Curated annotation (Swiss-Prot):
Organism from which the protein derives: Methanocaldococcus jannaschii (strain ATCC 43067 / DSM 2661 / JAL-1 / JCM 10045 / NBRC 100440)
Family per record: Belongs to the UPF0284 family.
Annotated NCBIfam families: nicotinate mononucleotide-dependent phosphoribosyltransferase CobT, PRK04447.1-5, PRK04447.1-7
Source domain of life: Archaea
GO molecular-function terms, A-Z: nicotinate-nucleotide-dimethylbenzimidazole phosphoribosyltransferase activity
SUPFAM superfamilies attached to this UniProt entry: Nicotinate mononucleotide:5,6-dimethylbenzimidazole phosphoribosyltransferase (CobT)
Protein name (database record): UPF0284 protein MJ1598
């Protein structure tokens, strides 16, 4: 099978044949407008989360002329997610937790305002409320399986901040959407924020989120806990950003992790990232399955897809997790690649 599994613990059997709901939680971070902590180009960073979910839901981006694409010509991972949605007929519903620009599709709004300034220790002041909104929303979503992704430019920096704030060894271990991972800049930004917010070992998980998290995190934690409490499996579809969500879940409700109903689903590109260590982070949190989908992009006809194998983009918009589900449920990964290749010039025509 084209899945790399660590601590699988029978999780793949739990998602086989299940009828899923895919949701992507989007947010923006004010810090990204002035400090280059994101791999997304500053000219499009305000529009990227909305353009991503528009592509997944509608089949094309509306907020931008084309779907997001990076400097190496690598298309947004939303192209992978769209392929799985289309090929496996997966229902999808998207959630705004503070994107700068709102998507031009139907969506659920949980918070209108973006995440604030991480370096000031002022990410938000309502993380507990956002958690409860995510939790209550999850209780009202009817699906046999939740696959939840994110599109948050700069989100690996907030992931680092939350992991450090909760006491994990995470410096130099979070991934990046770009080939050159600016570890030192990320560490400087979050250390400043943690210090200014007065975070210490007595601080609560919500204190840490309010200081250096992003608004996606408490929302996804609430969604995941609400599903797992009802004995429904959850794929946290993402890389090191979802490891931070996992750490938040552990702080709020450790018992749900012990049920073996929550797993991280990511891409081979994150798991094999030499400048990150998703496996090492998750092992500190608990015995949680980490599942990575393989795509065989080295055989792609499009150079931008081949660049994923060289460290570009890697993950996002739930790509790895929704692909894990799709592959377990009999979709050949070559079909994902072929779908993107067939649609590429339609999506990216000027």
């Amino acid at each position: 099978m084209s899945i790399i599994a660590i601590n699988e613990n029978g999780f793949l059997d739990k998602i086989k044949g299940r009828n899923p709901l895919f949701t992507c939680v989007i947010s923006s971070i004010e810090t990204t407008l002035s400090i280059p902590i994101s791999g997304v180009h500053r000219d499009v960073i305000k529009y990227t989360p909305s353009a991503d979910v528009e592509l997944v839901f509608y089949g094309k981006s509306l907020t931008l002329k084309t779907p997001p694409i990076d400097a190496t010509g690598s298309p947004t991972p939303a192209t992978i997610t769209r392929a799985c949605v289309e090929l496996k007929n997966i229902k999808n519903l998207h959630i705004d937790a503070g994107a700068f620009v709102k998507p031009k599709i139907p969506f659920i709004e949980i918070d209108e305002k973006p995440t604030g300034r991480i370096e000031e220790g002022k990410a938000m002041n309502n993380s507990k409320e956002l958690y409860m909104k995510g939790y209550l929303l999850g209780k009202n979503l009817d699906a046999e399986l939740l696959i939840v992704g994110e599109s948050v430019p700069g989100g690996t920096t907030t992931a680092l901040g939350v992991l450090l704030g909760l006491g994990y060894d995470a410096e130099g271990k979070v991934s990046s959407g770009s080939i050159n991972n600016p570890h030192e800049l990320k560490i400087k930004v979050v250390r400043e924020g943690l210090k200014k917010a007065g975070i210490n070992e007595k601080s609560s998980v919500f204190d840490v989120l309010n200081a250096v998290g992003d608004k996606m995190m408490p929302v996804v934690a609430g969604l995941a806990i609400s599903f797992a409490e009802r004995n429904k499996p959850v794929i946290l579809a993402g890389g090191t950003q979802m490891s931070a969500v996992l750490a938040v879940i552990k702080e709020i409700n450790k018992k749900v992790l012990d049920k073996n109903l929550i797993a991280i689903g990511t891409t081979e590109f994150v798991l094999n990232d030499k400048k990150g260590d998703l496996k090492g982070i998750v092992e500190q949190i608990g015995n949680v399955p980490v599942l990575a989908s393989k795509f065989y992009f080295e055989k792609a006809k499009i150079e931008g897809l081949k660049n994923y194998c060289k460290g570009s983009v890697k993950e996002g918009v739930g790509a790895g997790g929704i692909a894990v589900y799709s592959i377990v449920n009999d979709l050949e990964p070559t079909k994902i690649r072929e779908f993107i290749e067939n649609k590429f010039y339609e999506w990216y025509k000027e």
